[in-house]
């Protein structure tokens, strides 16, 4: 090694005598290597293939390179920002014209829920029951609920009162459309749980499925969950109640003719229902907003574990006070085309079918005897 360095020393010159240094370097002795070094080819796409979820289209299109799908992303209907705005406006106007359109309500809930999803997710993660819901993801419908068992509970229990409320209002938990616009499993379950819990809010707030009751519940949801769909529905319900109240007023022509004839203006024996709803709404809105802002996050409640609990105890625990006035119960929906308008109720259909089966079985037993 010393001989090599000694022979190489006069070849590498410094200072002013190094003008031919580049040519002298070619005469340096070469050292043979035992393993040839091969340089691996490097391409711009080798970094993109590190992530197994990165689409190949993002390697060629730099505009989509920053968009990587989440691991829990599910099949959904893709929408752009402009598309969501148009769907929000269209579904809101459609619901204002016909509030019984459940498909429009589901669409409005999904396409407008973007700003509030983080708040809902934070509310569920803040409690142990909410975190358990996000892991187990149970559902409330006629296939997961033992209707016969809940109907056998004594009055005052949450499960029994829920069944009685369904009977009184002619509704059920199965009229919920799929959340086809949500991109991830987590967001899809948030919307599903929000919609499945809506009837429980009615029950705890003592509100029927009427125009007044629905509007009050939407004000409650707006104060507690900041859901845009709750704001749209609350504003739409208020406008409809206000329009009904204005239409019940005497026409100007009637007032003028009554004044000219010096006859008393037409009076009703009692206050019209529309005017009564408007007066009740003015009283119930502050109460609903106050209860919504002070009660516990109901989105994280495991209703499946509350069937046998006392409903009044639950109201005290959730800090839900009684309404300042009593709201009239549901008296049935108007019929259109010979059919009653309303949400489908598979629970009531199940009870009716079971009753018919029992009657048929009794007839069979009697015929055998």
UniProtKB/Swiss-Prot annotation:
It is found in: Mitochondrion inner membrane. Pathway: Cofactor biosynthesis; ubiquinone biosynthesis. It is an enzyme of class 4 (lyase). Its EC number is 4.1.1.130. It comes from the Eukaryota. Its cofactor is Zn(2+). Zn(2+) binds at residues 198-199, 202, 214. Residues 332-343 have a biased composition (Basic residues). The keyword Lyase applies. It is a peripheral membrane protein. It catalyses: a 4-hydroxy-3-methoxy-5-(all-trans-polyprenyl)benzoate + H(+) = a 2-methoxy-6-(all-trans-polyprenyl)phenol + CO2. GO terms for biological process: ubiquinone biosynthetic process. This is Ubiquinone biosynthesis protein COQ4, mitochondrial. It comes from Mycosarcoma maydis. The gene is COQ4.
